């Protein structure tokens, strides 16, 4: 029997998961039904079509969210961490680097991750915009103010990011719980008025709708997918809450509430087809519009916050895995290490979100932009999951194909339906994804070219030290730490120091930082020291992609292995690389120029590794790619 403390902890995590994980999918009822039956889709609002659409949505929640994500994908975790970056790292670890699958899997996972950035722009825009549009249901006099009010809310939200969410974050769970209870109550009220809608629970109506409406049903699928946006968040946030609280929050709260509300909106439209212009806000009558606008705006802000935080987390992982240059990362909570803020990402995302709101102008226009990136990410997740369960878990091939193939057919159907919206806004998140994909691959390849160049001119460290101490230079008091990449040979900073200063510190440490394709490396395994002789040491510091790189903390850990450091007697020598594009070799010249620009704006190693600036000596070196 579980102890009371464990039960209360599980309940707290479940409530927190309701607030963070389900904000996106929880706000989908604001716009999904409205979009399915919009005039542009040409689908008649008949009782038969209503039953079919509601049945599609409810069974989509069962198959896509409950079975695929909650039951299968949550099991494919990378040491407890989820998200497409973690899944990509797990899939890559399932095959060797020489495997024919390695590069395609990396490209696929990377493209899925960049599509997440496209989603992260659309989610705040469509969530807040659709919430504020409720004012227009009350009176058309509010229509001119919908976009300005939305922009003001979003600018305010992004402006507060630097302060962190630790203070208001504790209210996310209770507010979203009230939101889901409200969804359920509204649904039940309308179902009581038109219980015939419960026939939609029979999947035959979904199948009959698809077979009986031909191309119109195919078009409708592109709008139905709006009910499943946010499913990826279930997996992405697993590291914060664990699989069990996420599952409990889904099956006990989110899924019943969403199903009841979609059934309720269907019941409302059976009785009052004119409500199709915005069925969500007309479920309880005119008296409820203003309270619902207030509550839905809070829910939309929470959904947006979860997406923004997810973007910060994804960026940090991408930096650690070598797909993006180092950036300034601020920690906004002393107690919660996952609470981070990346200024460059925050302001750039805010600008793009505001432009999306102004450019598209309404949630209906944004809805056209939403589905392609979401369904493409779903496909990538399914394929990566196949490689994990087949090559890492060693499940039977037929079982793996059957399990993931079923979901892949659904993903492909939804993706194909959304491709019809490519020229009606679907290009927007795809363009964002392609731009970021190009930048990430360019950075990854550029770093490889820099490494190859340095390797060509590298002097083996052991041979160099052996020859150096035949006629040793003058030793001066203190400790010198030279940052050195894996297999880099003698650090350029050391060669420059010996060339210019003609001296060597009495203790020399070569420090190599390695990032592993796992979320976390325990402190006990982070530091390894090898004695090279003559008071020279090789110190390897290993982090996972969700660890916080902290060299001073690593030096403290070195005490346990007999190497103590006094910071005021320690100097860090770091080579500052100036990268120069070479038209003869390497990448295409335009990509090389992009890489050079990214390198120029990358955060310095000293800042990124939290090395005190007054202990750092930077020495320049030029590298051609």
From Swiss-Prot:
Catalytic activity field: K(+)(in) + H(+)(in) = K(+)(out) + H(+)(out)
Keyword Disulfide bond part of the UniProt annotation: no
Membrane topology: Multi-pass membrane protein
Listed InterPro entries: K+_transporter, K_trans_C, K_trans_N, Kup
Cysteine pairings via disulfide bonds: none
Transmembrane segments: 10-30, 50-70, 102-122, 135-155, 172-192, 214-234, 251-271, 284-304, 340-360, 369-389, 397-417, 422-442
Molecular function GO labels: potassium ion transmembrane transporter activity; symporter activity
Function of the molecule: Transport of potassium into the cell. Likely operates as a K(+):H(+) symporter.
PANTHER family linked to this entry: LOW AFFINITY POTASSIUM TRANSPORT SYSTEM PROTEIN KUP, OSMOTIC STRESS POTASSIUM TRANSPORTER
Name used for this protein in its record: Probable potassium transport system protein Kup
GO cellular component, one term: plasma membrane
Subcellular localization(s) per the UniProt record: Cell inner membrane
Domain of life: Bacteria
